[in-house]
Amino acid sequence: MNPSPSVTELQVENVTFTPSVQPPGSTKSHFLGGAGERGLEIEGKFVKFTAIGVYLEDDAVPLLAGKWKGKTAEELTESVEFFRDVVTGPFEKFMKVTMILPLTGAQYSEKVAENCIAIWKFFGIYTDAEAKAIEKFTEVFKDEIFPPGSSILFTQSPGSLTISFSKDGSIPKDGVAVIESNLLSEAVLESMIGKNGVSPAAKKSLAERLSALLNVTSDKMK
């Protein structure tokens, strides 16, 4: 096990993302890789809906370093392959999505489901198994309401996605549902930071912070 990388907290609007967490359903420590808002242009104005924090298991840095150390933040930001390696890498990830504006569970899950299906169709891997996983995913959210400050939490483990909810910023120990689907688990994160990810700000933040951490790792290995 590698020591936790030394990182700072991040603020997105009035949401604070702590430097490290132990996600629901995991026994491992995760550090804050990056964070940013998700918003849409509405009538000429950028409206922010959620703040997204992406955490990575501590082992992620040495696992990514072999291929990506020495790259600048700009190079990582522009690299589709880098973000695919983050999404598909053999380490846990944790995503905390905190509401800036209120959303219903149906509004949130339907948009995520739509993005996941688009990703699978792009890769040519949308089958009945994925359709069933999406059904389970939307079912978990159907009766939920998320006021500002409440959070949706995703723990991405190899082969499964643990979903949790928090109304007060705390991190629960266990999830409300576990969906056994590696492709769904990866697609949820891909929809945030992938090629057409919904949060360019979180992607940029992740690239900047990981570039610095990977270069520290590179210096230590010299």
From Swiss-Prot:
Keywords: Flavonoid biosynthesis, Isomerase. Belongs to the chalcone isomerase family. GO terms for biological process: flavonoid biosynthetic process. Substrate binds at residues 50, 115, 191. Gene3D superfamilies: 1.10.890.20, 3.50.70.10. The record marks 108 as: Important for catalytic activity. Pfam families: Chalcone (PF02431). SUPFAM superfamilies: Chalcone isomerase (SSF54626). The keyword Glycoprotein does not apply. It comes from the Eukaryota. Expressed in leaves, flowers and fruits. GO terms for molecular function: chalcone isomerase activity. Part of the biosynthetic pathway for all classes of flavonoids, a large class of secondary plant metabolites, many of which are brightly colored. Its EC number is 5.5.1.6. It catalyses: a chalcone = a flavanone. This is Chalcone--flavanone isomerase. The keyword Isomerase applies. Pathway: Secondary metabolite biosynthesis; flavonoid biosynthesis. PANTHER family: CHALCONE--FLAVANONE ISOMERASE 1-RELATED, CHALCONE--FLAVONONE ISOMERASE 1-RELATED. It is an enzyme of class 5 (isomerase). InterPro entries: CFI, Chalcone_isomerase, Chalcone_isomerase_3-sand, Chalcone_isomerase_bundle_sf, Chalcone_isomerase_sf. Catalyzes the intramolecular cyclization of bicyclic chalcones into tricyclic (S)-flavanones. Responsible for the isomerization of 4,2',4',6'-tetrahydroxychalcone (also termed chalcone) into naringenin.
